[in-house]
């Protein structure tokens, strides 16, 4: 930024020094002009006049011996060069400069070329801030003025040194602090912006133009002091003075961009300025006389005098102590007169000599605490304009003199700056030189009016914040640009400089305010803090400074390499050495600046850490204490420094010599530190106090902003303290000639020590806080541990308490169980006693007590309770069934005890039997175990005992028959209500069984059992009527037949098995036909809950196995009652018994005649001749069907609780007992010993087949105890086929066992099929096709089951009456059997399960469909029907199955898209990088969804399909196709072509059973 200003300054300097021979004609004008300026007392600065006079001054500088056209061209070129600095268009300025050069003529081409180059460089740097450019231009004019003044002094031959010194001092006093409204300082000290903002020119007073010439040209008032050498003409010390000039110029520029302006206590400056104005008038008179003698040949004096006398100055003071701004009134009418007045080329000398005097006057300003700011500004402007007149009197002397070279001019300027520092008493340097660096708003507005170019106010405000390092660029650039146009060197010019230095020194010694006001330096800045506003952007100034410094140095080297090469030839080795030292010092300065930046970073970190951790009130107190302590220390240091400063400074001013000091390059840290402390105590004290207080109040929420502001304030103040000593000469305590460039070391060390101390304090505080936090954390951790321990203890106590409670509960439960067991045992004993009592009293009280229920497998307690509960004969049937349900519920917990009870009861009953009943007992035992014959015998026996008490037997038999039919109908209705099936199915079953029960074409659709084995035995045609007499003791029994007859029986058994299989097939066909009528009318849900068979405790059905169990436990009691019946019957007459039996048989024969005929016809069709010698004997083979029941059955309930039925059919069996007694049949049956019969062998063989053909899962080991083979029993009179049916040979009980085992494995499993038809004889997996073929072959077969009542060869012949009564009795028994079978069949029909072919989809089908998804994703309906053969498909379930696969695909594609997008976000580039392994997450999710229990191994091709699908989705998403509407359709087409054939084992109907 500053490089552009340097370029412009070089252009201006070149123009001034190139035309060094054309400035002789305007000297007298300047003298008259200056004298006129001093006479004005009413000063009123205006913006337009200052801007116009600046342009005029530049034009006058170019005027001389050149023609008027060339003068105008040079003026326009310089205006173009500086016009680029004030916001104008760079292109227009360059073009304007080119045109002016072409019009100037050949005499000005050499200067124009160089000026044009500089102007173009300035145009390239138009981005620089206006503050930098204005400062640079001001310095250029200051340097030019110093050269001109030096030449004037040389011409005067040191005639008036004292007046020159006085003149400089007086002029310097006129530089007052500018208005404070343009910028404010940090820490409460206001910064001076410009002094030209308070000036305005009145009317036609054109002489004031010389005062503000360089203000307009440079953007700020010229404040650099051009002081000649202090050595009174000694030419031997010229080189040393040049070196000092270089150093002083460097320091001055640093102070320009860094210092802070003081806006207070300006009345002292005004008083000194008034005294110096009188001295200026005398000095101006002397100069006028001298110039008139030397330049009497000049012709332009009268014109300039007339023009200059017109100008008058006035200052309008605005007396407003509250407002910091100073309003400036511009008078546009002054512009015309100002622009017409030609100005002296040396008009800037007054400004250049102002810095020295201002230093001394500003010293008094700092020491005085008054606040009269407005008056001081006005008087400052008056003094400045009065100083301009004596300075211009010296300028005409330069006409006959040759200007010095670039080197000498710069050295002279540095000497003057050095003397300025000596006379400034230290602290005035800051405010003076600071005013050079910062023009105010009024300056900018004046320049805008003159140049007709607009400047941004923001750029002007930012001028105050420019970098402090741009001074290096400015000083070197201006120094070389000032001398760029001058190539000749003459030594006599140095004499004038020496004379001026002597006068300046004498004037400083005579100054009344130099020593008197030195002791008033100590000012408590904190009390004045309210007058200032903090500056907010100090950090940005320092950041921008480094860039400007480096760029300016590079630009300097680019522009002036040629001039340096020429000037280096004229320089002595000492000067070159000093230049090297100066460069070294610059490098040191840069390194220190870097260190300072590092310290700033550390401080920022420290502040951030402090802000994060200091949030408690303790930190506020600590900050306040630190602030107070540091303020006290600083105040003490300031007092000591201010006491030590005045005396050395005064002594040093008195002993100033121009000789080079041998200790120029020597310095000590102590001296530098003292120098640092004495730089600006007021600024340091006020800023540090404010910064410390700001740091103490930094605990507000926006902490980082506060910390940065505090840091910026501290760094700005420290940088000012660091660089302020570089302005002027060395500290008074230092040796004479000590290079001030090294003095900033003290400030750096002081700042570093301060920061280090503050850093250590912060570290200590942070360590303390960290220790406190650690202690708090430790305490919290201890508290948490204690709480956890307490919680654990509480939990342990609670656990112990719960354990104790559980133990107490267990103890109580055990005690309760023991108590219950004891009570139960007591009840059992009581029940046993009651049973014994009832059995003992059964014979004498047969009418009062109904037959007690036999002990069954359900338990003796239940049987005894049932016998006690049903003591009343005329109780309702509903009440009986209700009591039965209660007994069944209590029977499960009493199984073990009931078995023992049964044995006890049986043993007690056996003890009551006599020897005469042994034969009958054996026969009854063998018969009861396999059929209902024993039960019928028991009923008949009890009926005989009751019959003796009735007088009318015929009426009793008739009533019994009628009541039997009614009770059977009532029982069927009750069973219908308790069936879980729908009423429609029950009605169908009733209609199917209503006609002829034995003539059914097949079982109901839901029936999966073969024909029952409870059909009544019938005697074949041609049977001997007397054969019944030998029914129990005939040696022709099937088990006592010769071997040939046994072979025939075995053949009959095989035939019965074949017929049984045919009946099963016929049932399948019937079920299929019925299922065709049923159809699924609505769509199913996704998962259908399986309708499992209800295992109710109150189930009223009965199975053959249950009947066998019941009869096996109660055969002894029945046999005992039968024996007693026979003994009592022996005392009656045969005729009476026979008559009663015949009457009873006659009454019931009519009811069963039709059934008998049908059954006889079936026997004729299905029977075979076992022996050819007996043509009339035909054996009726019975078939067994598979049923699905296992609980206690209906018949046991009827036999135990329907007393009316039992009472009315007892008469039907009385004939049998009477015939046995009358015929004299032996009581003993076949012997127990001997070889096992064929039935027993078949039972053992079939049990092995059952275990071997059991499904996996150790079915044989898990079978219920009921399905174990029964106890060995004597041979029965039943056919072996009937025994085979009873012993698991296709019996319903076997299938019940199979389902019970499967339900025990997993009742809730979806994979258990309740539709299997395993009967123990066929393989586990059935083949539907073969079954259908067999069913079609046997479609006409009848499935009415029968029990063959074997007819054996009689050994005794009875009468006709006996034969008739036996036939009638047999018919009655057959009727009872058919009635019981109807009830049993109906119960099976009501509780049957789903048939083989069903239209209902179950959860097992859903699981199968999920597994099929591994092979096919888009199956057709034909494929689905092929792989679901057990489903009868219709439109509803087909759509349901298709919907399942649609849902499968939806889940599949959702997962694919999810993981594809995840892969895109993870940064995968190509689809080939996507690989699906067995342990990948996507593969695991899919397997968990479709193969939850790992039923099958996932095929390898499915992994390939998943991988391809994922890649397709990845390509689509990566290519951006997912934004389209139907972007997935193409992927669906690709995946649909990847289906594979499903394995064949999915077609198996048994596949669902294998899934678990």
Swiss-Prot record:
Residues 286-296, 374-388, 802-813 have a biased composition (Basic and acidic residues). Residues 455-474, 627-646 have a biased composition (Acidic residues). Its main location: nucleus. One of its GO terms (cellular component) is nucleus. Residues 1398-1556 are annotated as: Homeo-Prospero. Belongs to the Prospero homeodomain family. Residues 1457-1556 form the Prospero domain. Keywords: Developmental protein, DNA-binding, Homeobox, Nucleus, Transcription, Transcription regulation. PROSITE patterns: HOMEO_PROSPERO (PS51818). Residues 181-198, 226-243, 390-402, 1001-1010 have a biased composition (Polar residues). It comes from the Eukaryota. Residues 150-180, 275-285, 299-309, 343-370, 814-834, 888-908, 1249-1260 have a biased composition (Low complexity). InterPro entries: Homeo_prospero_dom, Homeo_prospero_dom_sf, Homeodomain-like_sf, Prospero_homeodomain. This is Homeobox protein prospero. The Prospero-type homeodomain and the adjacent Prospero domain act as a single structural unit, the Homeo-Prospero domain. A motif (Nuclear localization signal) lies at residues 1090-1097. GO terms for biological process: cell development; nervous system development.
